[in-house]
């Protein structure tokens, strides 16, 4: 025991040396273990009666520490001090499981945290109401972040609407910076609630706010983001089928995200037959207007062209109120289709029945003068009668129109925002408010189309 006291005294009076903490601890541990071994071998120290507290301290002092143990301790934070009830809630006090969690166990763990429970979210304002659903602005009690709660009423005789099932099944697998994120799903006897990330504006509101006069640089940034999200969907054989400004959500940073996948479909083969009762009338391609039920990703590209025109001019391209009027507006601008511009069109019974006048095509530049030459070229490549001839989203991303955005926008990870690049910034809009972006207020619902 005297040897131990002398050793501790020498250690406390020693002069610090320029060595690392690990080296000092390693040397101390080695000397301590050697001294302990020598003491046991010499047998010179007389055993003395120790109190229980001193016995515990002695056992702790005699414990051998490896360098692995020391490194583990050095890598820990100084003092975490997490509340015990929080640790119990997350079950962090239990040792790690030797095997990966099963799907059922993982669901149970998420449920313990609060996912999948209606009481986890607080409803704030009603954003709008439709036939099957009501959308609320809400807040998560877990994260304190704002969310959008899409509450779908369940009819007992019908169950969940097919649009809701479709939206959930598709969105749960889509992880992209330009696609709205589905955070949670809550199923009760009376409702199905989809919890989305909250974006408090959309492209329609943005246009209204800037007096329908956007900066052309901002048009390019929004267009690139739209194509980026759509290319991600099309690469996974998913068609949106309902593109319009109200379904393109925008946050305060200017990030644009595809939303409202209620009409979207996973396309297994190009020839699969679908319903032609899809897509808002103004953004519906002529082949669908004439009754086509066999289509692929080009159905979305016509709508992209209409949205590009609307951003550049501040007004919708083909605002028809009926199918016949919609076709009439299209043919007056692009010319009445012929077998040369649209092979097979004369064999479509609906086309023959309408008996349209023979319109000649008009130059797009005279209708969208703010678009530059490359922009007009891109628009022309999207507004083609023959669906398979329309430019794809992937090809459109590489169009010279976007060259001014630089090369780095094409190298981003799917989940990375283009605004993570310092060279990508919105500019002032020349509209009556003259702001690059500002929230359009906290008033009425931003859209009805989410239902």
UniProtKB/Swiss-Prot annotation:
Keyword Transferase annotated: yes
Annotated GO biological process: positive regulation of myelination
Keyword Secreted in record: no
Enzyme's top EC category: transferase
Expressing tissues: In brain, kidney, intestine and at a much lower level, in fetal tissues.
Catalysis: reaction(s): L-seryl-[protein] + ATP = O-phospho-L-seryl-[protein] + ADP + H(+); L-threonyl-[protein] + ATP = O-phospho-L-threonyl-[protein] + ADP + H(+)
EC number(s) on file: 2.7.11.22
Keywords in alphabetical order: ATP-binding, Kinase, Nucleotide-binding, Phosphoprotein, Serine/threonine-protein kinase, Transferase
Active-site residues, Swiss-Prot/TrEMBL: 242
Positions with a binding annotation for ATP: 127-135, 150
Phosphoserine, modified sites: 12, 51, 66, 75, 109, 417, 420
PROSITE patterns named among the record's database cross-references: PROTEIN_KINASE_ATP, PROTEIN_KINASE_DOM, PROTEIN_KINASE_ST
GO molecular function, one term: protein serine kinase activity
Domain Protein kinase: 121-402
Family per similarity comment: Belongs to the protein kinase superfamily. CMGC Ser/Thr protein kinase family. CDC2/CDKX subfamily.
Task performed by this protein: May play a role in signal transduction cascades in terminally differentiated cells.
PANTHER family: CELL DIVISION PROTEIN KINASE, CYCLIN-DEPENDENT KINASE 18
Protein name: Cyclin-dependent kinase 18
Lineage: Eukaryota, Metazoa, Chordata, Craniata, Vertebrata
């Amino acid at each position: 025991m005297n040897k131990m006291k002398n050793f501790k005294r020498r250690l406390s009076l020693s002069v610090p040396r320029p060595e690392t903490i690990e080296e000092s601890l390693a040397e101390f541990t080695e000397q301590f273990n050697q001294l302990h071994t020598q003491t046991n071998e010499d047998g010179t120290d007389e055993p003395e009666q120790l109190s229980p507290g001193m016995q515990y301290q002695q056992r702790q002092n005699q414990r051998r520490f490896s360098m692995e143990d020391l490194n583990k301790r050095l890598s820990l934070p100084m003092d975490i001090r997490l509340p015990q009830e929080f640790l119990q809630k997350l079950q962090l006090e239990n040792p790690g499981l030797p095997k990966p969690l099963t799907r059922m166990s993982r669901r149970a763990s998420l449920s313990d945290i609060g996912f999948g429970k209606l009481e986890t979210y607080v409803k704030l304002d009603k954003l709008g109401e439709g036939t099957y659903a009501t959308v609320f602005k809400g807040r998560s009690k877990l994260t304190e972040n704002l969310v959008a709660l899409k509450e779908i009423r369940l009819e007992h005789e019908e169950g969940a609407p097919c649009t809701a099932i479709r939206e959930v099944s598709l969105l749960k697998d889509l992880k992209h910076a330009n696609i709205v994120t589905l955070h949670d799903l809550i199923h009760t006897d009376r409702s199905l609630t989809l919890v989305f990330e909250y974006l408090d504006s959309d492209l329609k509101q943005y246009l209204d706010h800037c007096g329908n006069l956007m900066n052309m640089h901002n048009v390019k940034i929004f267009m690139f983001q739209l194509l980026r999200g759509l290319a991600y969907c099309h690469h996974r054989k998913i068609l949106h089928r309902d593109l319009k400004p109200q379904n393109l959500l925008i946050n305060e940073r200017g990030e644009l995200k595809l939303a409202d996948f209620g009409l979207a479909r996973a396309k297994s083969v190009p020839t699969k037959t679908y319903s032609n009762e899809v897509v808002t009338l103004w953004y519906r391609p002529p082949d669908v207007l004439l009754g086509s039920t066999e289509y692929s990703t080009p159905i979305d590209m016509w709508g992209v062209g209409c949205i590009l025109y609307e951003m550049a001019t501040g007004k919708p391209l083909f605002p028809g109120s009926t199918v016949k009027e919609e076709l009439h507006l299209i043919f007056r601008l692009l010319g009445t289709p012929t077998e040369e511009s649209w092979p097979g069109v004369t064999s479509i019974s609906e086309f023959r029945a309408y008996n349209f006048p023979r319109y000649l095509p008009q130059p797009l530049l005279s209708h969208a003068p703010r678009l530059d030459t490359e922009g007009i070229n891109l628009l022309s490549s999207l507004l083609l009668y023959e669906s398979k001839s329309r430019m794809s989203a992937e090809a459109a991303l590489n169009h010279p129109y976007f060259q001014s955005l630089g090369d780095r926008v094409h190298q981003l990870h799917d989940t990375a925002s283009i605004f993570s690049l310092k060279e990508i910034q919105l500019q002032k809009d020349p509209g009556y408010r003259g702001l690059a972006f500002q929230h359009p207020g906290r008033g009425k619902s931003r859209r009805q189309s989410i239902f």
